[in-house]
């Protein structure tokens, strides 16, 4: 099936964010898709070593800090974070995250 419905269960709840991971690996091994909800933001700063992260802000507002540069974001904005970047984000946000290649826990470094 090519239509993936929003997962009903939370896939993870950590460091200030809750996420629902779409089961897309059987359709594509080149990208992963995650629905992110946060009330206050990411509690840590990370470096994602292998995947580009592309966030589309569906609701809310806040800011991303990427490589020590802070930029505000709100609904309708697209935030592109290249692999190897140091980043965090804050705010009450609902976002669709596309990561390419798909995210794996071992490729992420928490600072």
Label each residue range with its predicted role.
Residues 1-32, 45, 110-111:
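A short, N-terminal "cap"/entry segment at the start of jelly-roll beta-barrel domains
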Residues 7, 37, 99:
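Residues at the C-termini of beta-strands that transition into short coil/loop
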Residues 32-49:
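Conserved short histidine dyad/triad with adjacent acidic residue
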Residues 50-62, 67-68:
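Glycine- and acidic-residue-biased ligand/ion/polar-headgroup-sensing regions
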Residues 67-84:
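Short acidic-glycine-tyrosine-enriched beta hairpin
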Residues 83-106:
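Ligand-binding loop in jelly-roll beta-barrel domains
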């Amino acid at each position: 099936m090519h239509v993936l419905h929003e997962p009903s269960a939370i896939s993870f709840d950590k460091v200030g964010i809750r996420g629902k991971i779409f089961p897309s690996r059987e359709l594509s091994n080149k990208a992963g898709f995650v629905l992110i909800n946060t009330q206050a933001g990411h509690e840590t700063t990370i470096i994602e070593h292998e995947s580009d992260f592309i966030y589309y802000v569906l609701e809310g507002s806040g800011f991303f800090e990427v490589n020590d540069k802070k930029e505000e974001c709100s609904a309708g904005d697209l935030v592109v974070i290249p692999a190897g970047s140091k980043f965090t984000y804050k705010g009450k946000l609902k976002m669709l995250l596309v990561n390419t290649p798909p995210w794996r826990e071992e490729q992420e470094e928490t600072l």
